[in-house]
A protein has these predicted regions:
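Short, structured segments at the rim of ligand-binding sites
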Residues: 1-429
């Protein structure tokens, strides 16, 4: 795997336009299978999982034109299924998002139970299979595979999810929009990328209400039409560059931001002593900030940032705020309420000299503003943890190395090039 070689200590200055959110792009691409008509998607990031989906569509007979420079994909699935077999793309966890589209199109989903994604913790197939069962699918299981099959059109249903799963919510929505009758999902995920998928389907003629809430109601339609849609900017990338600007005492502006999603995120920056200026569609940080962690009014209570399903603080952003806190003055607790392995990378962070105490698998305390030193660290297969390790290294004078940093490429195309434009001295080794 590629490594990042970093000469730290330079302030980052300049402007950034984030790429499209991969967590919106991938399910939207899968949802395009729900229509035979032309679909045009803009602001598609050039990442490996998109490449795998595009290859899969082509292998199955779809017509796909991808203008990588313009970040646009045009798709026509009228001939999908006339070539190849429906085996899901390997090496990408988002292949579960093909469950509903494939059941609608060809009536079956052959699934090898070894999908790979981040190393954050156990993520079940059961919620997806349970949802498909509610819509009428049958599961056939062997020692190494699970087949989902459906013999007749899906029927609308009411489902109360065990927890707010992003991908399970997206699968429910994709199943329901073409199911007969009405469907209701309770305890639905409401992240910005889930909202993107719903709005894309509405653009094609789906009837969805409750977008952005925990209760989604859908009236099934007979078919979906053609349409065009622009993927929202990646809020993970927005936070990454704002935090880097603050950590290196630089001036960074991030444009094309859906700032209506950032109220809680901006307050979380403020907890760590960083002021973020909101100017409509632009967020900025400026040099000269004190970066002192805010103490609660209640004495003897640690300040904390809790991550949980939206509209809580997004769990994927937690590593970035941990990195930021390492360079802040004071102590702060981080609580990951979602993944049991979300802090497995912390021992690598301490190699820089960071002082972090692990309370339990879901909680840590960072004691900030300790002397740091260059180091060679190993990134886990967790995208934002790899980014966080780079962020800390970028603030330390001298040469550091983040080995096995390739997970960054799963979400952040041109990451190193963007850093270099801002003044960072970093390259793939």
């Amino acid at each position: 795997m590629p490594n990042l070689l970093i000469q730290g200590g330079q302030p980052l200055n300049g402007t950034i336009r984030p790429h499209g959110n991969k967590n919106a792009a991938l399910p939207t691409l899968c949802a395009s299978l729900l229509t035979d008509e032309l679909v045009v998607l803009d602001n598609i990031p050039h990442i490996t999982d998109v490449e795998k989906l595009v290859s899969y569509f082509k292998d199955m007979g779809s017509k796909v034109y991808w203008d990588k420079g313009a970040k646009r994909i045009e798709l026509s699935h009228r001939d999908f299924g006339k070539a190849g077999n429906a085996a899901l793309p390997v090496g990408m966890r988002s292949s579960v998002l093909l469950f509903a589209p494939l059941l609608h199109r060809i009536g079956q989903v052959p699934l090898a139970v070894n999908a790979k994604g981040c190393a954050l913790g156990v993520r079940e197939l059961d919620p997806h299979i349970e949802i498909m069962h509610h819509f009428g699918a049958e599961m056939i299981q062997s020692a190494s595979a699970i087949d989902l099959k459906i013999a007749k059109p899906m029927q609308g249903c009411r489902h109360w999810a065990d927890y707010m799963s992003v991908t399970a919510t997206e699968n429910f929505v994709m199943a329901a929009v073409l199911a007969k009758g009405n469907s209701i999902l309770l305890n639905a995920a409401s992240e910005p990328h889930v909202q993107d998928v719903c709005r894309f389907l509405v653009q094609l003629g789906a009837k969805i209400s409750g977008i952005g809430t925990s209760r989604i109601e859908i009236e099934g339609v007979d078919s979906l039409s053609s349409g065009a849609f622009q993927i929202s900017s990646d809020f993970h990338e927005v936070v990454t560059f704002l935090a880097l600007g603050a950590m290196t005492d630089g001036h960074v502006e991030v444009h094309d931001v859906q700032t209506e999603h950032f109220d809680l995120i901006i307050r979380s920056f403020a907890k760590l002593g960083v002021s973020v200026e909101n100017d409509g569609e632009t967020l900025s940080v400026f040099p000269g900030q004190t970066r002192v962690i805010q103490k609660p009014l209640t004495s003897n209570i640690l300040p904390k940032i809790e991550a949980a399903p939206w509209p809580y603080f997004p769990v994927d952003l937690l590593p970035l705020m941990i990195a930021l806190s390492v360079r802040a003055q004071g102590e702060v607790q981080f609580w990951n309420k979602v993944y049991e392995n979300g802090f497995s990378w912390i021992p690598e962070l301490t190699k820089f000299g960071a002082h972090v105490v692990t309370s339990d698998p879901h909680r840590i305390v960072v004691f900030g503003n300790r002397p740091l030193r260059p180091a060679t660290v190993e990134a886990p297969y967790i995208i934002r943890a790899a980014v966080a390790l780079y962020m800390v290294a970028a603030t330390i004078e001298g040469e550091s190395r983040v080995i096995h940093a390739d997970p960054i490429r799963r979400a952040h195309p041109g990451f190193v090039e963007n850093l270099q434009r801002l003044g960072a001295v970093v390259h793939w080794d």
